[in-house]
Amino acid sequence: MSTKAKNLNQKSVGQVIGQFTKDWMSIVGLLGLMVVFTIISYIKFGEQYFLTWANWKNILLQASTVGIVALGQAIIMLTGAFDISLGRMVCLTSCIGGILMKNMGLPVAAAIPLMFLVGITIGSINGFLVSFIGVPPLVATLGTQYVCYGVAKLITQAVPIPNMPKAIAWLGRGYIGGEIPICAVIMVCLYVIAQLLLTYTKAGRNIFAVGGSSEAAFFSGINVKMYKFGTFILASITATFGSGSDVPSELCCRYQRSEL
């Protein structure tokens, strides 16, 4: 093999290593942190308290709502925007769902579509303000956040709504085979669907293009405003999924759900 061929081969290996580092270093670092915290927790609390499947089930249960909402936020951020109202959107849609099902006696099958309708309406307002009016995402979603919070507090009078119907409680406290939380399964399914859409569809690639350079995407024939608008709709849908798992996970609807 000639020296030139060897140099090309070495360069290609270096490129592969560099690409691997670029693509996977954040994931490797995250896994490393998980291992470190697991070891520290094991040393501090012992195996009987931390390294148990019961504890991992509880972690999955508690993290599912945040994980579902984070998916929608990530999709918006791919376009270069963000939405700080998603947590309060979860708050409002869960409170509305609780009132419809518990106070008004509406069947779960009828209440859930109305929850999605409310969430999509809020997402549409955010998307319209940011994409078509040109309001900065921070200003637009900050205002929407406080509107959602105020409406949720108004309609619930800051009082929890306990004892949700069993059908909706199954989403937040139900388990497959008594071991795997339903809400965690929903979260994983949503992530898989999002990965497939973003990787293998034209719309997904266009979302990345908009985030990379909105001007270049515009001159390439991509409707930048509509794609940004659409990501806010998708985020509102994931937030409503999160509210569906949040309502029964606490067995009540609370306007104080502001930590998201």
Regions found by a protein language model. Give the residues of each.
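Membrane-interfacial amphipathic/re-entrant helices at transmembrane-helix boundaries
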Residues: 2-68, 107-110
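Hydrophobic alpha-helical transmembrane segments
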Residues: 23-31, 59, 88-92, 109-117, ...
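Hydrophobic core segments of alpha-helical transmembrane domains in multi-pass membrane transport
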Residues: 26-40, 73, 116, 145-150, ...
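Single transmembrane alpha-helix segments in multi-pass membrane proteins
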Residues: 32, 37-41, 52-104, 128-135
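Hydrophobic alpha-helical segments embedded in the membrane of multi-pass proteins
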Residues: 63-73, 91-92, 121-124, 146, ...
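Alpha-helical transmembrane segments within multi-pass membrane transporters and channels
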Residues: 105-145
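Helix-loop-helix "hairpin" substructures at the membrane interface of multi-pass membrane proteins
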Residues: 106-107, 111-112, 121-126, 177-253
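Transmembrane helix-bundle core of multi-pass membrane transporters
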Residues: 133, 137-200, 227-230, 250-258
